[in-house]
Amino acid sequence: MAGMSLQHPWAFAFGLLGNIISFMTYLAPLPTFYRIYKSKSTQGFQSVPYVVALFSAMLWIYYALLKSDECLLITINSAGCVIETIYIAVYLVYAPKKAKMFTAKLLLLVNVGVFGLILLLTLLLSAGDRRIVVLGWVCVGFSVSVFVAPLSIIRLVVRTKSVEFMPFSLSFSLTISAVVWFLYGLLIKDKYVALPNVLGFSFGVIQMGLYAMYRNSTPKAVLTKEVEAATATGDDDHSAAGVKEHVVNIAKLSAAVDVVKTREVHPVDVESPPAEAPPEEDDKAAAATAAAVAGAGEKKVAA
């Protein structure tokens, strides 16, 4: 790292800044997991973003180890591996049995199976610089596939004309992170680090533009499939919060070459349509409604 700071002082500066931003982003889910710990329940939140984040960090550590002078990638992704492992462990402690089984299977499939296959193929079928090229394009492909995720958020914002699921601070931080890591990759002449962040920067700018466009708009009464699916099972508040948390998780994953995180969110109230009363209950319902209206009128006058 000392050699890098002397030969590429600007690269070292941007890499260090990227480490700081990414580390803060890794710590963003702490309020969420504090809630999980206090309530002894995962509250409908999903484990997928954390498993994918761990896989991403593992990939970039392997890539950095194959190259020289990539200490800055190793440090931040090593920290990411530790933090994401802790998040997943906490999730497994408090998740219901079905969610535990799903998370365990996902870990075995992605972090053991897929990563093991990549490790085996790159070690056996390639060598030297060719191995770095193959793994570099694997990392780029994974990053690009993750960058598709913000499209669902952008579509949701356009459909609902609401920026509830896309806070400006999040979009801004993702854009800055993408710029920093792009400059780092550009200065060290590593296209595999730089290229994915061009797409990340583009999506960040689009999201900030949509925020400026819809921040004062009246949201449409559109119930998305994601929220409908969440509220179909379990508590409305916790399930809706889980959907929002998952959306934010995936958006953050596309911020930098090694980052996928969450932020604390507040539950979204999603009201279910009232069940239609039987015909024989019409008179009772009408009477109850009249009484409620009268009571409300009395309170208003008293106020």
Swiss-Prot record:
| TM spans (from-to) | 10-30, 45-65, 73-93, 106-126, 134-154, 168-188, 193-213
Sorted alphabetically, the keyword list is: Cell membrane, Membrane, Repeat, Sugar transport, Transmembrane, Transmembrane helix, Transport
Main location as per UniProt:
membrane
Q: Which residues lie on this side of the membrane: Cytoplasmic?
A: 31-44, 94-105, 155-167, 214-303
**Protease: is it a keyword of this entry?**
no
Question: Which terms in the GO cellular component ontology are assigned?
Answer: membrane; plasma membrane
- Which biological process terms from the Gene Ontology are attached to this UniProt entry? carbohydrate transport; sucrose transport
* InterPro entries assigned to the protein according to its UniProt record, in alphabetical order: SWEET, SWEET_rpt
Work out whether the entry's keyword set contains Zinc: no
Can you list the disulfide-bonded cysteine pairs?
A: none
The subunit structure is:
Forms homooligomers and/or heterooligomers.
Q: Which family does the record assign?
A: Belongs to the SWEET sugar transporter family.
Q: What does this protein do?
A: Mediates both low-affinity uptake and efflux of sugar across the plasma membrane. Confers blight susceptibility. Confers TAL effector-mediated susceptibility to Xanthomonas oryzae pv. oryzae.
Name under which the protein is recorded:
Bidirectional sugar transporter SWEET14
Species this chain originates from: Oryza sativa subsp. japonica (Rice)
Upper classification of the organism:
Eukaryota, Viridiplantae, Streptophyta, Embryophyta, Tracheophyta
Gene, per the UniProt record: SWEET14
